[in-house]
Regions:
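General detector of N-terminal leader/presequence modules that precede the first folded domain
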Residues: 1-88
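Intrinsic-disorder/low-complexity coil detector
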Residues: 5, 12-15, 56, 94, ...
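Charged, alpha-helical interface segments at or near domain boundaries
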Residues: 49-129, 133-140
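Cys/His-clustered metal-coordination modules, chiefly Zn-binding fingers
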Residues: 111-180
């Protein structure tokens, strides 16, 4: 599923069958999937999934969400660990793991370190993955990374109007983007 393709090749978000599918998924998972249309990344995932697979029932949709979250988390972690190696000269390993849902046919959970990666939007997933990397390095390596170059403090991964970013905890300026 390629969510980076032109929007013109995707199902229109007001298509009645698409909206009915979202309502069915929302009921099955007790989650407002129509609310996920408010984020560009969530909308792209849902439209691409419907376009590519049709109105798949909940048990077949759940693994698609699991894979979507895992792939995004792994990409962000790989990019951040490359950056951490460049900044520190050290090689780190931060686990990305998936746990199956306790509910039959439910959506599983993805974790970076101990941080859950939830939602459908790549920016939100990038923020959670970055927090997971940062906490894991602090807990396991006793390392504050990344550092704000102006204040030598650890910034916080935050959603900004421009996407995921490391934001200084002292003056709230953007230190660096977080890949998403």
């Amino acid at each position: 599923m390629d969510s980076a393709r032109p929007a013109t090749s995707l199902t229109h978000p007001d298509e009645p069958a698409f909206r009915a599918w979202l309502r069915a998924l929302s009921h099955a998972f007790d989650h407002d999937f129509e609310g996920d249309l408010g984020s560009p990344g969530g909308r792209a995932f849902l439209l691409a999934t419907f376009t590519d697979n049709g109105a798949v029932p909940a048990p077949y949709f759940a693994p698609l969400v699991d894979e979507h979250r895992r792939v995004h988390a792994e990409r962000v972690v790989a990019a951040l660990l490359t950056r951490a190696r460049r900044d520190t000269g050290r090689v780190f390993d931060v686990p990305v793991r998936h746990e199956w849902s306790d509910a039959p046919d439910g959506i599983g959970r993805v974790f970076v370190g101990h941080e859950p990666v939830e939602g459908l939007d790549p920016v939100s997933m990038a923020v959670a993955a970055a927090e997971g990397v940062q906490c894991h390095l602090a807990d396991r390596e006793l390392l504050v990374w990344p550092l704000c170059p102006d204040h030598r403090t650890g910034p916080h991964a935050t959603r900004t109007p421009d996407g995921a970013a490391w934001v200084c905890s002292v003056t709230h300026h953007v230190v660096a983007p977080v890949p998403s």
